[in-house]
Amino acid sequence: TLSFVPGIEKLVRLIGAPVVTARIQNADRVYPRWAQKVRKGRVHFEFDPPVQFERKTPPEEILAYIRERTTLTPENSRNWPVTGKNLALGLTNIVYACPSCGGLESLVEDKSKIACTACERAWELDTSNQLNSLDGGTSLTVTEAMHKAQARFAQTWLQDTARYEAEGIIMESEPLSLMDQSDVDGVEIATGRLQLTETELRMIDSETQWSLPLSDLRLVSVEMTRKLWLTTQDKVFEPIMPKESVLKWLHAIQHWKAAAES
């Protein structure tokens, strides 16, 4: 379950409309957030009766109800058989560091397997989203592997410590296209590499000069699995990364923007 939008409980109380909560069972197996294709299997929707909250209901009580009725746990989740091929394709977008050695962007996908080019550990993914070790190492769930990747990155929030100390470069991307998605038809505005510093995002190796102060960012988000959106007051920019994890970039930008504002 993803985090709730801040203030949703206050919005419910303000509007005064009945609340219908729902749970989607087995969707995490049929269409995981990293998957490039839907697997074959059953998805089950459960809806609760409408609940009306009074204006005087404490917000924390409303939030507790919504969280309880929409959160799936091992105790209340229902699973059905799922089949599919190439299960690991797209997985390194969310597991962007090796669960064993912590190497950033060191994992390579191969159909339903991932392997680390640094420590040579390997895993095979099954339809229950379990990463099973192929070499006597530790098996773990995708969720556990994702949390390990985030924890590893959060130790420094840097791609290369030495380069950061020498040049102030926090992150530098693979070659990419930068799009302006503010209108219905997106427009390419630059090609090159995206860099992140403590104060800005900027394009290098590009014929077009482009930079965006972190202070101008209103929102950074990942949409539809691999769309990294950089939203300002009047523009939406999207760096289209062919292979690199956009979730890693999301976490980095969020961290350094917050650090700059603190």
Question: Across the structure, where does each feature detected by a protein language model lie?
Answer:
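Short, surface-exposed beta-strand/loop "edge" segments at domain boundaries and coil↔beta transitions
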Residues: 187, 208-211, 234-241
